[in-house]
Amino acid sequence: RGKRAEAENHLNDILQSLIFERTEKGKDPYWNDTAGQLARGISKLILMMEERLSIKSILDWRHAKMQSGMLQNCFLALSTDSDIYQDLAGFMNLTAENTKTCIASTFDQLTGLFKASKALTEMMSGTTFSMEKIGKERTAIFLVVPDEKTTYHFLAELFISQCYESLLDQADACKGELPVRVNFILEEFC
């Protein structure tokens, strides 16, 4: 139970960066919020189905499995008091097709960067290192993001946030202190 709650907190942090915080100033947050609930519901459904959760699998459920009716079938099989049902209901129970289309379009707009770049989607769907090693052994990570183009800045923020959360968890497990000192050097970071 503790690991599940921790995993859901990490999922919420990621979705916060990818979707919820990306509402433009002056715009109605309803669209991003509902698209974010859809993303959270799909993510939790993927985990419930014991599939590997990644950007790629979320996009697969949003497009192929939504179009085939599989998402609808899974939704209808859920208990109405489950958190997955509650997350998906804001979208799935809509009867106004225009509203539903606008929410799906908002979802697609917020995840379009990944859909447009297969290389980015693949990179975000796996890892070649363990975050836990950062606080346990000497490690250098170079994250290069173009400073003249802000498109990918939120991904750098997401990585740093996830890394920091991982380091906090490790420090808690090691009586408040990491085995190896960790320095973040952020150059020209906005």
Spans of model-derived segments:
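P-loop NTPase motor domains
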Residues: 1-190
